[in-house]
Amino acid sequence: MATKVEEINKLKKKNLHFRQCSADSLSNSSMQFDLSGLNTPVGELATSNLPSPAHPPFGELHQESRTSNSSAMHIENVVASRLMYNEVANGSFALEPKNILVVTKPRKHSLVYKTAEITKYILTIGTPETKVYVDMRLARSKRFSAHNIAKEANTDIDRIKYWNPYICLIKPSIFDLAITIGDNSTLLYTSWLFQKIGPPVLSFSDDDVPGFLTHFSLSNYQQHLYQVLTQNVSLRFCSRLQCSFHKYDEKTKQYSLASTTYSLDEILISRGEHPFISNLNVYNNSELMTVVQADGLVVATPTGSTNISANAGGSLVHPALNAILVTPVCPHTLSFRPIILPDYNVLNVEIPLDSRSSAFFSVDRHESVEMHRGDYLSIVTSHYPFTTIQNPGYQWTKVLEDKFNWNVRERQKPFSRKPSLSDVKDTSDDKFDITDNSYCREFSADIDG
């Protein structure tokens, strides 16, 4: 029987379809790979015979031993996947995309015009087989105008296609590259479109300032697109969380899987509209870790550590690290502090049967789903990371400095008694006329008195 290492090596050769380039084509990078046709083979990953971890019902989960086969298998799969993707990330790749998806931020007319410019540029410099898929709601848009784009690019209008979420769900492997035009929420929406496998993503920031997820400036889109379409690029695989929602049936005392969602940023469990604090049982690898009494709980990836988790007091974690962040939101006691766990751990968050009220959970800030007494979430690291194209000039710490205004705030200065230009002729005493901001709304009618 083939060993686990042999299965992983076979899977890499079969599904990822890496073909090392000849020695003559090697440039500055020590390794180069050809990623043409990457997504079609990767689509077989979902049906491959690689064993996947089994998650038993919650009622049995906390009774399992720490050395259970399912936990060991999950750890083995996560570590093997991590090694596989780390090996890929060390090379440079020639994408050679044929079908390019463009995701545009809504409610902003200027980005529709920019989508038209990018579409025309891709059709101009791309091969005759290159097709661009834009949001189907732009089909009748006068700002986009597919006929004008095809005419100005001197090409066939059939090269401009339209996508909707259903196409991304049933045929994710037809896309070789995805381009996002907007902000972090646009990239999170793209992650939602491709819940499992998906194309590499080139993310443009709409405010021309790189963000935590949007690494490229929109003002220089021609330079970045030319490099991606004609040269080798580096990829980064951002870990995602798999969140499985299990519902409890009071009559049968059984659990049923209601939904499974993949998170790039975080999973937020909150009390929602209820006046009571949330009461949550948190299990780590089948053992009760703590009982959370707080306004909520955030389970985040390193990519999402700068979002809600940071607002709740969680640590900032570099997205290249492999970890799961668990952060309470306004805990009732200080006994539970933010914690960082290995990415191969299995977390289960349960609503106790004696809880005063239900709770709500949301994945990447999408619509909230109510959890009733007995329901639980099973959260593990997904085997389907989110692939982004790296910007060589992007530095995560630099973005922290810009977004969080590090080293920008002026230090408090001492009171100065030196006369300013407007005070040169002032012969009054040294007292301040206005000592502080007044918050009193009641003033005397006679201000001269």
From Swiss-Prot:
Pfam families referenced in this protein's UniProt entry, alphabetically: NAD_kinase, NAD_kinase_C
Protein's GO biological process: NAD metabolic process; NADP biosynthetic process
Top-rank EC class of the record's enzyme: transferase
Keyword Aminoacyl-tRNA synthetase: no
EC number: 2.7.1.-
Any one GO molecular-function label of the UniProt entry: NAD+ kinase activity
Annotated compartments: Cytoplasm; Nucleus
Principal cellular location given in the protein's record: cytoplasm
InterPro entries hit by this protein: ATP-NAD_kinase_N, ATP-NAD_kinase_PpnK-typ_C, NAD/diacylglycerol_kinase_sf, NADK
HAMAP family to which the protein is assigned, alphabetical: NAD_kinase
PANTHER family (alphabetical): NAD KINASE
Entry similarity comment: Belongs to the NAD kinase family.
Name recorded for this polypeptide: Uncharacterized kinase C24B10.02c
Organism: Schizosaccharomyces pombe (strain 972 / ATCC 24843)
